[in-house]
Amino acid sequence: MDAFAYTLLMTLVVATLFFAVAFRDPPKIGKDSGK
């Protein structure tokens, strides 16, 4: 199942990027989303 492995890998990459951004720059959603 290469498709399954590829999907799992993409999910891990996206999750890693999301958490990296979230922890680097704490969420200010609604307050200053213009920047």
From Swiss-Prot:
Assembly, per entry: PSII is composed of 1 copy each of membrane proteins PsbA, PsbB, PsbC, PsbD, PsbE, PsbF, PsbH, PsbI, PsbJ, PsbK, PsbL, PsbM, PsbT, PsbX, PsbY, Psb30/Ycf12, peripheral proteins PsbO, CyanoQ (PsbQ), PsbU, PsbV and a large number of cofactors. It forms dimeric complexes.
Kindly list the places in or outside the cell where this protein is found, as annotated in its UniProt entry: Cellular thylakoid membrane
Membrane topology label: Single-pass membrane protein
Domain of life of the native organism: Bacteria
InterPro entries given in the database record: PSII_PsbT, PSII_PsbT_sf
**Pfam families recorded for this chain?**
PsbT
The residue ranges crossing the membrane are: 3-23
Protein's name in the database: Photosystem II reaction center protein T
- Describe the function of this protein: Found at the monomer-monomer interface of the photosystem II (PS II) dimer, plays a role in assembly and dimerization of PSII. PSII is a light-driven water plastoquinone oxidoreductase, using light energy to abstract electrons from H(2)O, generating a proton gradient subsequently used for ATP formation.
Give the signal peptide, or none: none
One biological process term in Gene Ontology = photosynthesis
Question: Which HAMAP family does this UniProt record tie to the protein?
Answer: PSII_PsbT
Q: Report the sequence similarity comment from the record.
A: Belongs to the PsbT family.
Alphabetical GO CC annotations of the entry are: photosystem II reaction center; plasma membrane-derived thylakoid membrane
| This protein's UniProt keywords | Membrane, Photosynthesis, Photosystem II, Thylakoid, Transmembrane, Transmembrane helix
